[in-house]
From Swiss-Prot:
Residues 1207-1693 are annotated as: RNA-directed RNA polymerase. Methyltransferase: Displays a capping enzyme activity. This function is necessary since all viral RNAs are synthesized in the cytoplasm, and host capping enzymes are restricted to the nucleus. The enzymatic reaction involves a covalent link between 7-methyl-GMP and the methyltransferase, whereas eukaryotic capping enzymes form a covalent complex only with GMP. Methyltransferase catalyzes transfer of a methyl group from S-adenosylmethionine to GTP and GDP to yield m(7)GTP or m(7)GDP. GDP is a better substrate than GTP. It catalyses: RNA(n) + a ribonucleoside 5'-triphosphate = RNA(n+1) + diphosphate; GTP + S-adenosyl-L-methionine = N(7)-methyl-GTP + S-adenosyl-L-homocysteine. Residues 785-942 are annotated as: X-domain. Its EC number is 2.1.1.-, 2.7.7.-, 3.4.22.-, 3.6.4.-. ORF1 polyprotein does not seem to be processed into distinct enzymatic domains by a viral protease belonging to ORF1, but could be processed by a host serine protease like thrombin. For methyltransferase activity. Residues 510-691 are annotated as: Zinc-binding. It comes from Hepatitis E virus genotype 1 (isolate Human/Pakistan/Sar-55). This is Non-structural polyprotein pORF1. Residues 1083-1216 form the (+)RNA virus helicase C-terminal domain.
Length: 1693
């Protein structure tokens, strides 16, 4: 066997590529999302700093400090995920509301920039109290925060976090503060740039600018728009150098995360800190080079900028390394300063070759270049000197050693020491130097700095004083402060130092052993009763949990606890890890804080500790007011009754859903194993393992019981809680998605107790905090346009977020409704629990959101303003509210004023509940017209607009007018243009008419009406009957003014036409534009001609016209009538014209629309302008559209011109739509098929069809030889080696091809349309005579505007606007182009799926111009053929499925004749094309149109995206009339080649055909036609056949083909987005609808025709049921593509 080094192993290559793809997907899935807008330089900085993390840029916000904030957010996530419930130091005000896990926050009184931060802090939630205290100097309102600072606060907390808030504290100060808090761990994020270790100066790096004046350091990052960060230098230096604090408060400081010079420090209290050296900047990209002369002195008495020049300069490390390598390796004669300068200049330029950066470059200042050249030259000179001296002294030493005698060598061997510590070379020290010598070096490399200093805490007073005095003495001597307690600064160590803390480990490797609690424990619910009470669970759940006992198997491995809970017949799994996300029933998030070393867990207000004891597992629970211990014995408990477990799960789910609906912040979502487990109430990673393998996700209690109404059953006992949920009957409700288990009977004794939530006789029954849903008896009375509703019934049946109580001034329990609230929610009257007050109203969230509103007492005084305020004070909330009629009870407020006050002061979606007396009043006074509610905000904005408007000359008449909040009733008559809305108004019905323009005013006045423009009408509309014409186009503030001032108001207008325009661009018009609901719609126009109606039908689907003018739009003619333009500039350029806005509402006999280029944006953004322009004329409209603006919005004459050019006529035809009905479920056999497992169904299908999982995703078959035509190839045939799919199963039942591959497109072009065509020259008369058995002589066909309308309608449904239809110019490529596409669907097969050797299928798309030219003719011919078809012959899909099935069922004694064409399109030639042209001529199509069709079909060019084929004769699927002519050719071949006896039914669709007959034979002339055209027919004659996706069974009918449908589902890609899964569900649902009445019959027939077992079909139907229920499971697979293509041979014909 020969092996070669260049042979590639495909398997290994594929595995490597898949691994690389998986790595890339994993990196993207865990990428950091960068939200701010960044410059190119900022992006490069972030990418370099965040390596190796993957970044995803989604710019959507502007930040002042984008680079720092991205780093800050990343480090903040790390700190908060590990800290759990903690104390936070110096929190940013905007982060307070987002982090509920913080138990206390330490602030300082705001000064400077902090004041600005507090002003922009949120004014809601916990941040509001902090903001108020900070800005007003008030003391803290509660214990959650303080302003004493971290050093002055003593709030106890075990863990803390400090995000960039410790820069002004030393490590010693932090250690003492942590001791006062009792804190053991503190996560601190700090910004520690290395430049603070250098002397004062200005340092500029690639990322930031740092100014160091000796005391303070200011850092400003690249691209910042505000001031930089200002910190104390000494503190930053101490944080960099210190790794431990010694003394009475010892600490260990670890660097657990680092991004650039941003660090997360973990400060841990440790009794004996050990040495922990670390390298702070191992990835530093700068080297700091010293300037020998320094920055220079001060040139005068006054300081200048030169004093800020740097002693050191930041130089890119790659520049310094390359410069030193170049200089050190130069020849002695070549080494000089000028050569170094030349080289430095060369490497300082950035060089890019394509996308490869060959040289990064360096943009340096003159000072930096001078310092670098000087330092490099002197350093290299010193190194060369050392090299020379080392060689010289070494040679002399070698000569002396080799000259030694025997005695000298013996002496050295006997007396000189050697051992383990001996290192070669250590015995020689030719050169020694001092730190301050010039030869000690000119640069500082941060990459090799190592620090391990200790800082004594301030309690060591005597030692600190001695050290201070010694340091001062050393400074007096002119020396550096080298304290003997600390190592020297900047110790240089190896560059690969392994710092475990720096790499990210926050676990001490020497931690104490963790106790193992693994085992099986018995957890009875009775042992956790105190915890349930602390959790505020309803009595029902507590009682049910007390009767259950669970077995919990605990497994503890590597700081992780896995629990398996066995509860009855259910198994739950949970995994406890630090930082795990706990499921909640609200927006608030909770993360589990789990410390295995301390055996503690905490989240929210709950915490627990556990330990293994002799009696079992001992757990201590701590919560609000609870300190409870429980011991769980080892062993296995008896299994609880399944019915009890099911009832417990259902009650628990109802409680969770009720709490989720009522809670604003949310609490834990309680799972069964979370309440019956040793670590209650936590249940992270909840998983339910069902014992039934055919059960899907819907069998979980979280889905199943949501569909069950929790109504107490009177037949079952009630122990003070809601009884078992009753299952609705099948006849009353739809069939559930999965079968539900019947509820088990309650084994407890029967007691007589009142239902939950109802008062017992002689006692007050108090409902729990969260009530359960009961049966509703409310009645809907009215719905407002904003979604608000009025009900008759009980307020407590509402599902709104808030309930409003009619309270008293003191908010104490009272009578009436207030007493009912106290009965249900007594805790809501606790004043200490009020979260907010607004006026007299009080808001509380305990035990649910309730607003106590106070109405005035009308027994003492009538106070309408107080009544308005009572409702208005309840609107300061989020969510909806349910109201009573405030004050209408004891306070004797009349119903009418209270109801009107609610109408004016409520929010959208609110509900009002009326008692019976008020409900009868409402029904007697029900609004008969739509109402417009003017809220305070709308009124305020409208008044502002009126005030601005009254300052102009036009609006002076509106001065002093006001809009007040209230409710206005109106009548709105809307209609299509020209429907006669204005003509319907008579003078007796109106006093004043308000119109938007002077033209309309004059037209109304000519009719005798008192008409005014909106501004002048302000003087006359008060108390009058007002009609407002073109109401939507009036300025909304004037519209509201007139509607409110009028006695009655009648609006006229068209919502689809031009609305009011905000000419001032102040934003007031869209803010107050009212939402008007038409009371009546008029759809008949008396103005618009027929062609205009068709153009605007998209906006007016029901428009009809009485006009006799059929065509009124003309292009390219001289201007006539009134000129209409779109802009004021066009109006100035065309005298006598008016703008479209001014012409709105007017009618002209003839118009001319002039579209100018400056109106492009107006027309594209507002189609209403085009509608108004088109609907102003009655007879003729000339369009002058030089820029083509109207063509861009679909208004063109090309379609109409081509239609009349082809011989179309104006007239009427029957529509081509076939009426279809939906059969009723009279025999619902589908209901007997339960959902089944998807996996088992597809595996059974694979077993019975013999298909196996394919190792490849697709096959590129060998490309055949090009036999005719000319093929144009792309330069590159790049293909994808693999395909990613989301599939239902890994076994595909279709021919596997790769439609998206370039080689597949070539194979299809050559294999299907490049094959040689067999020409057949013969007369068509014989074939036409045979075809007459199915299609008799047609005769002349009339093509009318009905076919044109159907063509346009089809284009609109596909999202086309007609702009692609051009004038018929055969020289234009856009007119004659034929586009080729590869079909993205493969054929279902029961045979081989891979080795089929078939090329793909293609589809062509003719130009829209040709489709519009031939389309109406082909539609008319198709209608003529359908009218002539004999009885029992079915064409295409132009029939109702039930009719076809009935015809098949009637042919009981027939067999099924099937014919399958092979290469149906490829075998069509000049003969089939000639037959088509003969039928066209027979129908009366113009000769030039027939010859054009023959020309296009006989010689064509298929244009693929990157390939093209010039060929002849072949037919392509996708051209206009494809179904028509394919079906006609199919009919002609079958009827000419075969004779049938007792023909009962014949159906033809494309290349599919069946004939139901008793027997058949081949006709005498068949061989000639088959041989002449090269036809390939595959005939089958059997009892049951297949046709167009259905199974044809004579005597039974046409049944859906379940096997084929399920098999085709396996081939498609159903991802990656959810919209594909929804398309699958809808398609399967439509298919199952066909099986409603024939499911069982389908099982028997389909199994017989495919030769499979009936169980397979039964299983497939169940699988489809599961998919239709939304339970489809998808598997992502990455499979290679098998490429079998060879070279393509081209030959020019």
């Amino acid at each position: 066997m020969e092996a070669h080094q260049f042979i590639k192993a495909p398997g290994i290559t594929t595995a490597i590529e898949q691994a690389a793809l998986a790595a890339a997907n994993s990196a993207l899935a865990n990428a950091v999302v960068v939200r701010p807008f960044l410059s190119h330089q900022q992006i490069e900085i972030l990418i370099n700093l965040m390596q190796p993390r993957q970044l995803v840029f989604r710019p959507e916000v502007f930040w002042n400090h984008p680079i720092q904030r991205v780093i800050h957010n990343e480090l903040e996530l790390y700190c908060r995920a590990r800290s759990g419930r903690c104390l936070e130091i110096g929190a940013h005000p905007r982060s307070i509301n987002d982090n509920p896990n913080v138990v206390h926050r330490c602030f300082l009184r705001p000064a400077g920039r902090d004041v600005q931060r507090w002003y922009t802090a949120p004014t809601r939630g916990p941040a509001a109290n902090c903001r108020r205290s900070a800005l007003r100097g008030l003391p803290a309102a509660d214990r959650t925060y303080c302003f004493d600072g971290f050093s002055g606060c003593n709030f106890p907390a075990e863990t803390g976090i400090a995000l960039y808030s410790l820069h002004d504290m030393s490590p010693s100060d932090v250690a003492e503060a942590m001791f006062r808090h009792g804190m053991t761990r503190l996560y601190a994020a700090l910004h520690l740039p290395p430049e603070v270790l250098l002397p004062p100066g200005t340092y500029r790096t690639a990322s930031y600018l740092l100014i160091h004046d000796g005391r303070r350091v200011v850092v400003t990052y690249e691209g910042d728009t505000s001031a930089g960060y200002n910190h104390d230098v000494s503190n930053l230096r101490s944080w960099i150098r210190t790794t431990k604090v010694t003394g009475d408060h010892p600490l260990v400081i670890e660097r657990v995360r680092a991004i650039g010079c941003h660090f997360v420090l973990l400060l841990t209290a440790a009794p004996e800190p050990s040495p922990m050296p670390y390298v702070p900047y191992p990835r530093s990209t700068e080297v700091y080079v010293r300037s020998i002369f320094g920055p220079g002195g001060t040139p005068s008495l006054f300081p200048t900028s030169c004093s800020t020049k740097s002693t050191f300069h930041a130089v890119p490390a790659h520049i310094w390394d390359r410069l030193m390598l170049f200089g050190a390796t130069l020849d002695d004669q070549a080494f000089c300063c000028s050569r170094l300068m030349t080289y430095l200049r060369g490497i300082s330029y950035k060089v890019t070759v394509g996308t490869l950066v060959a040289n990064e470059g360096w943009n340096a200042s003159e000072d930096a270049l001078t310092a670098v050249i000087t330092a490099a030259y002197l350093t290299i000179c010193h190194q060369r000197y050392l090299r020379t001296q080392a060689i010289s002294k070494g040679m002399r030493r070698l000569e002396r050693e080799h000259a030694q005698k025997f005695i000298t060598r013996l002496y050295s061997w006997l007396f000189e020491k050697s051992g383990r510590d001996y290192i070669p070379g250590r015995q020689l020290e030719f050169y020694a130097q001092c730190r301050r010598w010039l030869s000690a070096g000119f640069h500082l490399d941060p990459r090799v700095l190592v620090f391990d200093e200790s800082a004594p805490c301030h309690c060591r007073t005597a030692i600190r004083k001695a050290v201070s005095k010694f340091c001062c003495f050393m400074k007096w001597l002119g020396q550096e402060c080298t304290c003997f307690l600390q190592p020297a600064e900047g110790v240089v160590g190896d560059q690969g130092h392994d710092n475990e803390a720096y790499e990210g480990s926050d676990v001490d490797p020497a931690e104490s052993a963790i106790s193992d609690i693994s085992g099986s424990y018995v957890v009875p619910g009775t042992a956790l009763q105190p915890l349930y009470q602390a959790l505020d669970l309803p009595a029902e759940i507590v009682a049910r949990a007390g009767r259950l006992t669970a077995t919990v198997k605990v497994s503890q491995v590597d700081g992780r606890i896995d629990c398996e809970t066995l509860l009855g017949n259910k198994t739950f799994r949970t995994s406890f890890v630090d930082g795990a996300v706990l499921e909640t029933n609200g927006p608030e998030r909770h993360n589990l804080s789990f410390d295995a070393s301390q055996s503690t867990m905490a989240a929210g207000p709950f915490s627990l500790t556990y330990a293994a004891s002799a009696a079992g597992l001992e757990v201590r629970y701590v919560a609000a007011g609870l300190d409870h211990r429980a011991v769980f014995a080892p062993g296995v408990s008896p299994r609880s009754a399944p019915g009890e477990v099911t009832a417990f799960c259902s009650a628990l789910y109802r409680f969770n859903r009720e709490a989720q609906r009522l809670s604003l912040t949310g609490n834990f979502w309680f799972h069964p194993e979370g309440l019956l487990g040793p670590f209650a109430p936590f249940s992270p990673g909840h998983v339910w393992e069902s014992a039934n393998p055919f059960c899907g996700e819907s069998t979980l209690y979280t889905r199943t019981w949501s569909e069950v109404d929790a109504v107490p059953s009177p037949a079952q006992p009630d122990l003070g809680f809601t009884s078992e949920p009753s299952i609705p009957s099948r006849a009353a409700t739809p069939t559930p998605a999965a079968p539900l288990p019947p509820p088990a009977p309650d084994p407890s004794p029967t007691l007589s107790a009142p239902a939950r939530g109802e008062p017992a006789p002689g006692a007050t029954a108090r409902a729990p905090a969260i009530t359960h849903q009961t049966a509703r008896h409310r009645r809907l009375l009215f719905t407002y346009p904003d979604g608000s509703k009025v009900f008759a019934g009980s307020l407590f049946e509402s599902t709104c977020t808030w309930l409003v109580n009619a309270s008293n001034v003191d908010h104490r329990p009272g009578g009436g409704l207030c007493h009912a609230f106290y009965q249900r929610y007594p805790a809501s009257f606790d004043a200490a629990s009020f979260v907010m007050r607004d006026g007299a109203a009080a808001y509380t969230l305990t035990p649910r959101p309730i607003i106590h509103a106070v109405a005035p007492d009308y027994r003492l005084e009538h106070n309408p303003k107080r009544l308005e305020a009572a409702y208005r004070e309840t609107c300061s909330r989020l969510g909806t509210a349910a109201y009573p009629l405030l004050g209408t009870g004891i306070y004797q407020v009349p119903i009418g004023p209270s109801f009107d006050a609610w109408e004016r002061n409520h929010r959208p979606g609110d509900e009002l509940y009326l008692p019976e007396l008020a409900a009868r009043w409402f029904e007697a006074n029900r609004p008969t017209c739509p109402t417009l509610t003017i809220t305070e905000d709308v009124a305020r904005t409208a008044n502002l607009a009126i005030e601005l408007d009254s300052a102009t000359d036009v609006g002076r008449a509106c001065a002093g007018c006001r809009v007040t909040p209230g409710v206005v009733q109106y009548q709105f008559t809307a209609g299509v243009p020209g429907s006669g809305k204005s003509r319907s108004i008579t003078q007796a019905d109106v006093d004043v008419v308000v119109v938007p323009t002077r033209e309309l005013r004059n037209a109304w006045r000519r009719r005798g009406f008192a008409a005014f423009t909106p501004h002048t009408a302000a003087r006359v509309t008060q108390g009058r009957r007002v009609v407002i014409d073109e109401a939507p186009s009036l300025p909304p503030h004037l519209l509201l003014l007139h509607m409110q001032r009028a006695a009655t108001v009648h609006l006229l207008g068209d919502p689809n036409q031009i609305p009011a325009i905000d000419f001032e661009h102040a934003g007031l018009v869209p803010a107050i534009r009212p939402d008007l609901a038409p009371t009546s719609w008029w759809h008949v126009t008396h103005r618009c001609p027929a062609d205009v109606c068709e153009l605007i039908r998209g906006a007016y689907p029901m428009i009809q016209t009485t006009s006799r003018v059929l065509r009124s739009l003309f292009w390219g003619e001289p201007a006539v009538g009134q000129k209409l333009v779109f802009t004021q500039a066009a109006k100035a350029a065309n005298p006598g014209s008016v703008t479209v806005h001014e012409a709105q509402g007017a009618t002209y006999t003839e118009t001319t629309i002039i579209a100018t280029a400056d109106a492009r944006g107006l027309i594209q953004s507002s189609r209403a302008h085009a509608i108004v322009a088109l609907t102003r004329h009655t007879e003729k409209c000339v369009i002058i559209d030089a820029p083509g603006l109207l063509r861009e919005v679909g208004i063109s004459d090309a379609i109409v011109n081509n239609f009349f050019l082809a011989g179309g006529e104006i007239g009427h035809q029957r529509p081509s739509v076939i009426p279809r009905g939906n059969p009723d479920a009279n025999v619902d056999t589908l209901a007997a098929f339960p959902p089944s497992c998807q996996i088992s169904a597809f595996h059974q299908l694979a077993e019975e069809l013999g298909h196996r999982p394919a190792p490849v995703a697709a096959v590129l078959p060998p490309c055949p030889e090009l036999e005719q035509g000319l093929l144009y190839l792309p330069q590159e045939l790049t293909t994808c080696d693999s395909v990613v799919t989301f599939e239902l199963t890994d076994i595909v039942h279709c021919r596997m091809a790769a439609p998206s591959q370039r080689k597949a497109v070539l194979s299809t072009l050559v294999g299907r349309y490049g094959r040689r065509t067999k020409l057949y020259n013969a007369s068509h008369s014989d074939v036409r005579d045979s075809l007459a058995r199915f299609i008799p002589a047609i005769g002349p066909v009339q093509v009318t505007t009905c076919e044109l309308y159907e063509l346009v309608e089809a284009m609109v449904e596909k999202g086309q606007d007609g702009s692609a239809v051009l004038e018929l110019d055969l020289c234009s490529r856009d007119v004659s182009r034929i586009t080729f596409f590869q079909k993205d669907c493969n054929k279902f097969t029961t045979g081989e799926t891979i080795a089929h050797g078939k090329v793909g299928q293609g589809i062509s798309a003719w130009s829209k111009t040709f489709c519009a030219l031939f389309g109406p003719w082909f539609r008319a011919i198709e209608k003529a053929i359908l009218a002539l078809l004999p009885q029992g012959v079915f064409y295409g899909d132009a029939f109702d499925d039930t009719v076809f099935s009935a015809a098949v069922a009637a042919a009981k004694a027939s067999m099924v004749f099937e014919n399958d064409f092979s290469e149906f399109d490829s075998t069509q030639n000049n003969f089939s094309l000639g037959l088509e042209c003969a039928i066209m001529e027979e129908c009366g199509m113009p000769q030039w149109l027939i010859r054009l069709y023959h020309l296009i079909r006989s010689a064509w060019i298929l244009q693929a995206p990157k390939e093209s084929l010039r060929g002849f004769w072949k037919k392509h699927s996708g051209e206009p009339g494809t179904l028509l002519w394919n079906t006609v050719w199919n009919m002609a071949v079958i009827t000419h080649c075969y004779d049938f006896r007792d023909l009962q039914v014949a159906a033809f669709k494309g290349d599919d055909s069946i004939v139901l007959c008793s027997e058949y034979r081949q006709s005498p002339g068949a061989a000639v036609l088959i041989a002449g055209c090269g036809l390939k027919l595959k005939v089958d004659f059997r009892p049951i056949g297949l046709y167009a996706g259905v199974v044809v069974a004579p005597g039974l009918g046409a049944l859906p083909d379940v096997v084929r449908f399920a098999g085709r589902l396996t081939e498609k890609n159903w991802g990656p987005g959810p919209e594909r899964a929804e398309q699958l569900r809808l398609a399967v649902s439509d298919f199952l609808r066909k099986l409603t009445n024939v499911a069982q019959m389908c099982v028997d027939v389909v199994s017989r025709v495919y030769g499979v077992s009936p169980g397979l079909v039964h299983n497939l139907i169940g699988m489809l049921q599961a998919v239709a229920d939304g339970k489809a499971h998808f598997t992502e697979s990455v499979k290679p593509v098998l490429d079998l293509t060879n070279s393509i041979l081209c030959r020019v014909e």
